[in-house]
């Protein structure tokens, strides 16, 4: 359950070799979706709304729209503005929301503490500082957000809408990419044979793509960048050939005047066709969402030096070819492959299919990542997360989501069988995410960057107007495919809101029904409580007080372990928590009670490894707390009040371990080994873990620096660990109180309970052994 030891922080100063290497690697991860858009943009634009004429006003107008859309949205908005709004190197919708949570104290997580604000990444980010002076409007806006819970919920729902549309894009992008790539076979065979080849081939490729997700991409990931690089070189070379061979004057269409002529001639039909032009910027959001895997400079270099010019040349080449071929539409749909020289069509078809698979892989991986972030922030049910690589940070696989995406992707592919309707659906999902980013960015500009409100207004009006124009053109196609992302987003949003609402109600019930520390301290006198050998971990969502499940447990079984730990594993609104800040440890009651509280903090992008090192880290953190408590004479007060212990920040085993030392069992069995050898470094420990899993023993070092009383407490801690660790968890069944409204009964009794029963519980998330786990059932009337 420890964060993976990958390097997730972007270096402040990188060598040019590192930057160029990252720029090259980003081609396969970030730009796969954006690079394959030439496959279907013209085909979707000229589907029905407008027609290609001999005056070339339509094709030149479309090219002008494509050029300025790519220039203004991916280049100006994302490369030069949005990429700067990173959350300690991380990007995406939740990165913006996390920034707002910290700078405006707008937090959807119920178990937040003041101690969380002392985290290094909480206090520092690369875009601004909370110590900078705020304008009067910014201070007023911040105060309004902090005071009004309704506005906070609206902000959360806005972020969730963007997230749901990203998930919808994870369904639609593989479908339209693979289907458009395979459609190239129509130029090489008769229509009778083509209709029996195109759809089955696309479905087989999609099934294979999703079936291979379980194995991870690290084995073939090194091929992604070369495939996209080859594809970009291919389409740019074909574009240059078509420009010089068919129409060298096509560059004139880059003038905005052709957009005016296009709309003047086509009027409402031209406006409706913008839904197809919109597809030229699909995948732009990936530049920001995948920022955590690369760096700002590397992503900017890759886009400005290679991706942007290649795409412009490709679109200009297609327009140049179509400007000299006005009867193609009567024979074939206007698509990418008609502009490819006939001798190159089969090789280009193969490269296009490979590029489509790479682009689809990127959006699928991104969907897994954003669902994990939602789950960490309490906005998505707990799901099984499989780490497919021990070396590459963030390579995860979620089985349930993978198969849901595959079924939905096959359904829309088989149901539509048409690039136009697939494009309408994909376009609406893409532009909705961009609108959400624009809205959140306007708040970030004021609250986090501390810029003038005029700058925020200019940003949201300029880019919001462009995106609203495309959004309206996509929304008008509701019955022609655009209903799909809306339906998908509604279903996922309903599940997310239901889970978040149920989680909040459960936490509120725990807070209202927690028992006082006085009750816990008086147990041995009133009920004759027995203390048994071993270490007991009471899993709770509370950061203070004693949970109701423990009182319920002790009332029915009056005994608990000689060392008792109230364990809270929670997420905080930062991307990563450093190992030295992972644990908050405190004491409950007098020393002789041996009762502790441990709060384990993870960021929303931290990777939890499913292994048994968590127990060792927990024992180490408690031992370090005991040692430092004695050394600093800051002994925890023998609290008899409601609010118990003072918490101390303690790191993992790799950062501190002077209180106790760990030994492998093979070392202890050797009589020649001294009893107080130095602690192993993290790397050797990791190498030996596979051979001696769960065979680590802790020993108190023989040193005069440790006082007798402290040594005794440390020895009892190690003896309790050797006696066995028991996990005591609550299994709550939630029911709405009698007299609750219909919506609340539907949300709690049906929606939340259905999600809870069909997703992973706390025992699965902690990877606790079945034989050592005790679940305490309770009914929560909320």
UniProtKB/Swiss-Prot annotation:
Record field: compositional bias (Basic and acidic residues): 664-675
Primary location group: membrane
One GO CC term, this protein: plasma membrane
Membrane topology: Multi-pass membrane protein
GO molecular function, one term: potassium ion transmembrane transporter activity
Record Pfam families: K_trans, K_trans_C
Domain of life of the source: Eukaryota
Keywords, alphabetical: Cell membrane, Ion transport, Membrane, Potassium, Potassium transport, Transmembrane, Transmembrane helix, Transport
Intervals, Extracellular compartment: 40-61, 175-195, 241-270, 318-347, 417-421, 464-474
Cytoplasmic topological domain residue ranges: 1-18, 83-153, 217-219, 292-296, 369-395, 496-782
Spans annotated as Disordered: 664-693
Spans through the membrane: 19-39, 62-82, 154-174, 196-216, 220-240, 271-291, 297-317, 348-368, 396-416, 422-442, 443-463, 475-495
Homology family: Belongs to the HAK/KUP transporter (TC 2.A.72.3) family.
NCBIfam families per the UniProt record, alphabetical: kup (TIGR00794)
Function description: Probable potassium transporter.
Protein name: Potassium transporter 6
């Amino acid at each position: 359950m420890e964060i993976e030891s990958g390097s997730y922080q972007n270096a402040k100063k990188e060598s040019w070799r590192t930057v160029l290497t990252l720029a090259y690697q980003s081609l396969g991860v970030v730009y796969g979706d954006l690079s394959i858009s030439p496959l279907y943009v013209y085909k979707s634009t000229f589907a029905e709304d407008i027609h290609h004429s001999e005056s070339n006003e339509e094709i030149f107008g479309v090219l002008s729209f494509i050029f300025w859309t790519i220039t203004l949205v991916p280049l100006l908005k994302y490369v030069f503005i949005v990429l700067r709004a990173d959350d300690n190197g991380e990007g995406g919708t939740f990165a913006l929301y996390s920034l707002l949570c910290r700078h405006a104290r707008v937090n959807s997580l119920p178990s937040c503490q003041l101690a969380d604000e002392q985290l290094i990444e909480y206090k520092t980010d690369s875009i601004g500082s909370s110590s900078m002076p705020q304008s009067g409007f910014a201070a007023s806006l911040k105060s309004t957000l902090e005071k009004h819970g309704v506005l906070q919920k609206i902000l959360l729902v806005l972020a969730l809408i963007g997230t749901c549309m990203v998930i919808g894009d994870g369904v639609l992008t593989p479908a339209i990419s693979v289907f458009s790539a395979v459609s190239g076979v129509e130029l090489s065979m008769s229509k009778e044979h083509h209709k029996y080849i195109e759809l089955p081939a696309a479905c087989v490729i999609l099934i294979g793509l999703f079936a291979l997700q379980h194995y991870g991409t690290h084995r073939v990931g090194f091929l992604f960048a070369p495939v996209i690089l080859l594809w970009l070189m291919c389409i740019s070379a074909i574009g240059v050939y078509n420009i010089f061979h068919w129409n060298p004057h096509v560059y004139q269409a880059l003038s905005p005047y052709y957009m005016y002529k296009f709309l003047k001639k086509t009027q409402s039909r031209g406006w409706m066709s913008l839904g197809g032009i919109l597809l030229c910027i699909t995948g732009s959001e990936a530049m920001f969402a995948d920022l955590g895997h690369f760096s700002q400079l590397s992503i900017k270099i890759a886009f400005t030096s290679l991706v942007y010019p290649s795409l412009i040349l490709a679109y200009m080449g297609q327009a140049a070819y179509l400007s000299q071929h006005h009867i193609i539409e009567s024979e074939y749909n206007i698509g990418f492959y008609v502009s490819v020289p006939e001798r190159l069509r089969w090789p280009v078809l193969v490269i296009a299919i490979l590029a489509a698979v790479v682009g689809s892989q990127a959006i699928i991986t991104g969907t897994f990542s954003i669902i994990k972030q939602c789950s960490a922030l309490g906005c998505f049910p707990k799901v099984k997360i499989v780490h497919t690589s021990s070396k590459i940070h963030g390579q995860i696989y979620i089985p349930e989501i993978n198969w849901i995406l595959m079924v939905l992707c096959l359904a829309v592919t088989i149901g539509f069988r048409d690039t136009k309707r697939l494009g309408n659906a994909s376009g609406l999902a893409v532009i909705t995410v961009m609108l959400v980013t624009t809205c959140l960015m306007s708040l970030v500009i004021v609250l986090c960057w501390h810029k003038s409100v005029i700058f925020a207004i200019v940003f949201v009006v300029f880019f919001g107007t462009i995106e609203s124009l495309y959004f309206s053109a996509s929304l008008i196609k509701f019955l022609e495919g655009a209903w799909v992302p809306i339906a998908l987003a509604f279903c996922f949003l309903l599940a997310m809101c239901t889970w978040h609402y149920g989680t909040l109600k459960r936490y509120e019930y725990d807070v209202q029904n927690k028992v006082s520390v006085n009750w816990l301290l008086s147990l041995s006198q009133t009920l004759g409580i027995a203390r048994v050998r071993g270490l007991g971990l009471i899993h709770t969502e509370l950061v203070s007080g004693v949970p109701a499940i423990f009182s319920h447990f002790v009332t029915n079984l009056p005994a608990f372990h000689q060392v008792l730990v109230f364990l809270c594993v929670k997420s905080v609104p930062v991307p990563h928590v450093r190992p030295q800040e992972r644990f908050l440890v405190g004491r409950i009651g007098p020393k002789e009670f041996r009762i502790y509280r441990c709060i384990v903090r993870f960021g929303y992008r931290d990777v939890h490894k499913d292994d048994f090192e968590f127990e060792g880290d927990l024992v180490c953190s408690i031992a370090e707390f005991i040692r430092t408590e004695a050394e600093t004479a800051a002994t925890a007060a023998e609290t008899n009040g409601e609010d118990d212990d003072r918490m101390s920040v303690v790191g993992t085993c790799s950062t501190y371990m002077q209180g106790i030392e760990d030994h492998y069992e093979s070392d202890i069995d050797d009589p020649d080994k001294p009893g107080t050898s130095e602690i192993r470094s993290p790397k050797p420990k990791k190498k030996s873990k596979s051979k001696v899993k769960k065979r680590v023993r802790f020993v108190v070092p023989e040193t005069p620096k440790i006082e007798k009383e402290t040594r005794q407490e440390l020895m009892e801690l190690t003896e309790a660990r050797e006696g066995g660790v028991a996990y005591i968890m609550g299994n709550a069944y939630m029911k709405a109180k009698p007299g609750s409204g219909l919506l609340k009964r539907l949300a709690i009794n049906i929606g939340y309970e259905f999600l809870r029963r069909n997703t992973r519980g706390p025992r699965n998330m902690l990877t606790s052994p079945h034989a050592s786990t005790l679940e305490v059932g309770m009914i929560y009337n909320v």
